Amino acid sequence: MFNRRQILGTAFAAGTVALTGTALSGAARAAGWRDKYPELVLGIVPAENASGVTDRYAPFVEYLSKELGTKVTLRVANDYAAVIEGQRNGSIHIAGYGPASYARAVVTDVKTEPFCTTVNSDGTIGYYSVFYVRNDSPYKTIDDLKGKNLGLVDPNSTSGNNVPRFLLNKLKIVPETYFSHVTYTGSHENAVLALQQKTVDVAANWWNSEEDSNLSRMVNKGLAKKDDFRMISKSDLIPNSPYAYLTDMPADAKAAIWKAFEEAPTKAKVAYDKLSDGKDREFKAVNASYYEPVVELIKFIDSLRKQKS
């Protein structure tokens, strides 16, 4: 379990792409919460490009529809904020957040409740923020990159913005003055592509292991070559991303949703494995206290912005 001092060493709706699961179990269409929720919307932050997320989640959406006995629609948001706002206005019932985007929702009073996260294949429950450079570049450390171009992911990305900013602050670096240009690329895939195309000189990304990272997924899809990139920095462990449902949903609906997630690795192994290219072991129950260190991180990042303004 993480504590506040372990995280990071010291402190640690917009346009969408929709996919609907239609294979409903007749027996499951019983009266109760399903009458109030004839459709559930699962909103996912765009860690990769929309088509990739849609392909990854399609079988899982079908499984959820069947298990829950109500139509489940997938929404892949254009940016992280769209998922936050979707839960704020009640149009997204279940959200697949990053830790920081969930924390941003909490800080801005969205009534959302994390119920599970993923366990990695090695049993750990976390991942890392890394900085990549091109392998053919001369850069070895952040010190070598003054005046160069930095590629981040999204203002509400944990490993793609907030943790990198925290780490740079520890080095007494203000990104907007240290680097020639800071670009939000929109997704982890886009950050790597920007580095590949030499639009940026260094890019932030998520990484779990050599076999499990955004870069390894891009390699598997033929979008990048592993040997073209080199890691120059890695953060301390960050809690894995949460799934969260609306706080005001009925208790029996919440229980049914968690049960469907919990049983997915055995009841729908192919669909479950597709979510992570087979790199995750299971879903694990969590609650809001698990992400309190990340909420504190977001408050810290906000305080830095206020100081600079």
Label the predicted regions.
Residues 33-103:
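Extracytoplasmic small-molecule ligand-binding "clamshell" domains
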Residues 40-47, 144-160:
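Short loop->beta-strand "edge-of-pocket" segments that line small-molecule binding or catalytic clefts
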Residues 116-141, 244-245:
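Hydrophobic/proline-rich hinge and linker segments of small-molecule sensing/allosteric domains
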